[in-house]
């Protein structure tokens, strides 16, 4: 019988982006330590190819983020995951966006709330189209809600609190780019790992600065 952890995947390109981003933040030795702890030594010096094949399993993604917390503690692991998420956007997710017409010019004339909503919707479409991750956007009380209904970051994990910090970092950097350099508060309010139905990230549409 097929394990449920093997049913859903990121494309190789996104797996590669995650590992390259980890290396940028932690150094190669840090990445190798995480891969060894996660029993993923086959990926050492052997990152996935830069293609769209769906071969980088959700369980692998979840394992990597969990090992960050095991190696560096909950607080240290959270900080690293946020930085890795920001790097993921700059190292490749932004390129997906450009392919979909998500350029600064496309958003320049929109007022900020419309710009954020259009950008968030387009990035949700990116994940829904190219990966097995499922994202839904909602607006409530002036805030944008980014619902991850099938989440690789906490796949098969159990926790007392939200753990999808990499997604928070990625969205923070995406919003920074979309808005032309403004900083927004992004907070994960619910998490499947904590028993909730979705991993929901709440985005304040008013920038901090």
List where the protein language model places each region.
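N-terminal low-complexity or simple alpha-helical regulatory segments
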Residues: 2-91
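Amphipathic, soluble alpha/beta structural segments
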Residues: 37, 112-121, 198-208
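Short terminal or interdomain "cap/linker" segment that borders an active site or interface and mediates
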Residues: 2-13, 17-18, 127-168, 176-209
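Amphipathic interaction/junction segments at domain boundaries or subunit interfaces
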Residues: 53-166, 190
